């Protein structure tokens, strides 16, 4: 992630989009789109979080969400909608749901920050699991003496310990709901 995360705000109601942009622009790089089609033009790998209206006339938020997944983009998505959530949301691949009206800048800022923390947690967990797999492979093939004599193995152990601490710190910043969302599998 760059030093300042990039947030794409997508809503066909210009006053809402512009208000959200004002609330976030001091903390994040902000892009705005006033339609689903425009959102697709502004979406790229630099976008970290998308705040996406669910119902738009030209291309719905659900269609944009499908395209995000089809393109393999790794941004986090919060649906921001006046539509009360119903069971149909279970099939949608988003990370947060905000019900309009969102009239509190703090709620929007907190949502973006939480989504960014989840991204950090995912990245740290992937790195941790990759290193843990390497450590396990070495431990099954090398003798304890060889492991003890290896500077590379000791460095790996230290890196794993550091990552474990980072994961713990990041997880502390997430609440139970965030962690449930992290491990939710819609296919279950």
Spans of model-derived segments:
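C-terminal output/effector regions of signal-responsive regulators
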Residues: 121-188
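The feature encodes the CheY-like receiver
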Residues: 57-58, 71
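Active-site T/S-Asp motif of two-component receiver
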Residues: 50-53, 65
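Receiver (REC) domain switch/output surface
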Residues: 107-120, 125
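Helix N-cap/capping motif at the beta->alpha junctions
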Residues: 14, 32-41, 61-63
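Conserved acidic segment of CheY-like receiver
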Residues: 3-24, 50
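Active-site residues of response regulator receiver
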Residues: 53-54, 60
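A short, hydrophobic beta-strand element within the central beta-sheet of small alpha/beta folds
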Residues: 73-85, 98-99
């Amino acid at each position: 992630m760059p030093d300042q995360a990039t947030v794409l705000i997508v809503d066909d109601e210009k006053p809402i989009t512009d208000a959200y942009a004002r609330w976030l622009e001091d903390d994040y790089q902000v892009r705005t789109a006033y339609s689903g089609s425009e959102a697709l033009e502004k979406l790229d790998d630099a976008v970290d979080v998308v705040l996406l209206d669910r119902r738009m006339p030209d291309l719905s938020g659900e269609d944009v969400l499908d395209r995000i997944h089809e393109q393999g983009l790794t941004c986090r998505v919060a649906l921001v909608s006046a539509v009360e959530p119903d069971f149909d949301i279970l099939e949608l691949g988003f990370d947060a749901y905000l019900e309009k009206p969102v009239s509190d800048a703090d709620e929007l800022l907190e949502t973006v920050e939480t989504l960014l923390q989840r991204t950090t947690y995912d990245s740290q967990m992937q790195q941790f699991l990759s290193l843990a797999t390497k450590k396990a492979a070495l431990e099954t093939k090398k003798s304890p003496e060889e492991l003890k004599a290896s500077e590379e193995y000791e460095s790996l152990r230290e890196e794993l310990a550091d990552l474990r601490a980072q994961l713990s710190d990041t997880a502390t910043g997430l609440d139970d709901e965030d962690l449930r969302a992290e491990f939710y599998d819609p296919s279950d």
